[in-house]
């Protein structure tokens, strides 16, 4: 949308429900969005009880999901790092994780497959929307979770069913999304 508006400026501010984001046009067809800093505490995500949000275990349909990383990047996310992100039927397990009692405001669910330290492929269940072909906040949440778990560098490409986003994390955990 921004690229087609013939703006005199290459930078604007975008107001969301709970954040003010800086956006700037980079190159001919891309926009970099400063997403801000993630929130990590059980209260800020939020979780219904105080636990380690960087190592969550859930049981869904007799399947045990371990090592879930919960983070709020403007909305709440849980990321599970798995061998094959498309192995899991998100249409079945996505809504069950989204509506789990641990998540009082529901949660976005990402199955993430680390290809290498610069590339991650994801399969995303977005709360209230279902399985999606792409999700910017899921890309940011996945990148910060991978970086904190030392699975990826502070700059990583997140690949979706359709397209990809480049995510950079600076020294203060500020997240930049380009696509």
Where are these regions (language model features)?
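Active-site proximal loop and beta-alpha junction motif in alpha/beta enzyme cores
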Residues: 1-132, 144-179
């Amino acid at each position: 949308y921004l690229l087609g508006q013939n703006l005199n400026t290459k930078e604007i501010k975008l107001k969301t429900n709970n954040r003010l984001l800086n956006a700037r046009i980079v190159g001919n067809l891309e926009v970099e969005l400063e997403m801000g800093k993630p929130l990590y505490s059980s209260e800020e995500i939020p979780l219904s009880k105080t636990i380690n949000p960087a190592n969550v275990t859930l049981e869904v349909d007799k399947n045990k999901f371990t090592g879930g990383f919960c983070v709020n990047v403007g909305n709440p996310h849980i990321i599970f790092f798995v061998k094959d992100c498309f192995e899991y039927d998100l249409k079945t397990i996505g809504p069950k994780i989204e509506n789990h009692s641990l998540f009082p405001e529901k949660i976005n669910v990402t199955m993430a497959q680390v290809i290498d330290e610069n590339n991650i492929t994801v399969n995303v269940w977005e709360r209230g929307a279902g399985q999606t072909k792409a999700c910017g906040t899921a890309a940011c949440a996945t990148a910060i979770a991978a970086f904190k778990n030392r699975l990826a560098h502070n700059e990583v490409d997140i690949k979706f069913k359709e397209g990809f986003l480049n995510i950079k994390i600076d020294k203060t955990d500020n997240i930049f999304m380009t696509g």
